[in-house]
Amino acid sequence: MTQMLHSLLRAVGLPVPEGLANPSLAMVSCDSRSVAQGCLFLGLPGEQVDGGSFWRQALAAGAEAAVIGPAAAALQPPGPTDAVVVVPEPVAAWVGQLAAAFWQQPSSRFALIGVTGTNGKTTTTHLIEHLSVAVGRSTALFGTLVNRWPNYSVPATHTTAFADRLQAQLAQAVEAGAELGVMEVSSHALEQQRVAGCRFAGAVFTNLTQDHLDYHCSMEAYFEAKAQLFAPPLLESGSAKAVVNIDSPWGARLAQRLGDTCWRSSLAEGVLQQADAELKMTELTMSSDGVQGRLISPCGEGWFDSPLMGRFNLMNLLQAVGVLLQQGLPLPLLLKAIADFRGVPGRMERVLIPAADATQVPTVLVDYAHTPDGLENALKASRPFTSKNLCCVFGCGGDRDRGKRSQMAAIAARLADRVVVTSDNPRTEDPQQILADVVAGIPEGTTCTVEVDRAVAIALAIAEAAPGDVVLVAGKGHEDYQILGTSKVHFDDREEAERALKQRLDG
């Protein structure tokens, strides 16, 4: 695929500077280290460094031209003969639009659904992918764990990729035959305009609870970042194309803003039941084997049977079905396909030992819960697995929102019978100080152990748990690394739990 530079600029409404050459472009890149001949360098401002300031290096490496912002131009002023286009603020929005235009607007060539919220994004996107494929739609998934579409699958490096890579992935998925795509859209991606240039056919708001306040500074700013997904130019205007969880106060606020352009989803019952919810569930029966019930929608209602655990997964199910109904998929086939979805790695995942007698060891669950709301949901979902004791192993990440540390500790103390506080990803913070911040939220009288070494903490919890107890290891889920300082070292909660279970059986 090639495009002429002048045509590309005009396609997004940018003027062509006088005297600018008009080379043929074969690629676009935001990384000056990966440019080659035929490349348009897109200088993206970053949190620490303005990528546009590397335009000279990009041109020296073979880039045909560079697009930069006013700040980069002030740092490294281009001369009249340089192949540089200076765009106005917001630079990131122009970068996204240029990348989308280069790849011929891939998001407009299939039905792209965006999912945002503090918790539930990964499970909901995987559910949407599973259900869509089950009813015969060729589907692409872009998310925290993996990016995949027909005949292609690669582990993801970001929840939402940067614009140059994201638009290339969308184009590849469309060329591979994907008819529908589903994307996790983080608040960082929305605030940094990584999805600028995307056109979403549908959107889901899962919930909003405290997280990332080190970045957004306030819940109001966090909410407004998420809300960008539900308005033009990202979400197509017209009939209802969004599904919003109104059991979340922030979701109720968003739904009020959207009016008839969204379907409201709710699990509230009795006097709390949301009469105006288009999507709801009734006659629910939950057990350690999963959940059964009736799903009600504007397209009809029917029975479903799911092996997923926890009430929070019911909202994930409800919203996944709802947004696919908005895209015209049939309710009976969607309900049938729910039974075959076994979950997502690192989300309430049970650690099992082959050939082991389950009655001789505790039940061990690994979950990604790393926010107050997420930890509360995971603990409540774990409780039905035991009539005995529930142990919670968790920590809090360094260099991140400190306000949630004591909140998570209080939740663990309230809902678990025993708490083991340990390290998560300490990053550049003192691990002992993080532990002190967490322990400050644990009431006196709580059975609590503090162990800075996460592997030792997991082993200790499993060794001391009785058969029939449940040990919930929370915080890292699918992650196979731990961030110590500025380095990543291999670490997997599931591997450590399996090792501890084997050691227990071996005596």
UniProtKB/Swiss-Prot annotation:
Positions of short motif Meso-diaminopimelate recognition motif: 424-427
PTM info: Carboxylation is probably crucial for Mg(2+) binding and, consequently, for the gamma-phosphate positioning of ATP.
Cross-referenced Gene3D superfamilies: Mur ligase, C-terminal domain, Mur-like, catalytic domain, MurE/MurF, N-terminal domain
InterPro entries: Mur-like_cat_sf (IPR036565), Mur_ligase_C (IPR004101), Mur_ligase_C_dom_sf (IPR036615), Mur_ligase_cen (IPR013221), Mur_ligase_N (IPR000713), MurE/MurF_N (IPR035911), UDP-N-AcMur-Glu-dNH2Pim_ligase (IPR005761)
Chain residues that bind meso-2,6-diaminopimelate: R400, D424, N425, P426, R427, G475, E479
Residues modified as N6-carboxylysine: K226
Chain sites annotated for binding ATP: G117, T118, N119, G120, K121, T122, T123
Domain of life of the source: Bacteria
Main location: cytoplasm
Function: Catalyzes the addition of meso-diaminopimelic acid to the nucleotide precursor UDP-N-acetylmuramoyl-L-alanyl-D-glutamate (UMAG) in the biosynthesis of bacterial cell-wall peptidoglycan.
NCBIfam families: murE, PRK00139.1-2, PRK00139.1-4
Homology family: Belongs to the MurCDEF family. MurE subfamily.
Name of the protein: UDP-N-acetylmuramoyl-L-alanyl-D-glutamate--2,6-diaminopimelate ligase
Protein source organism: Prochlorococcus marinus (strain MIT 9313)
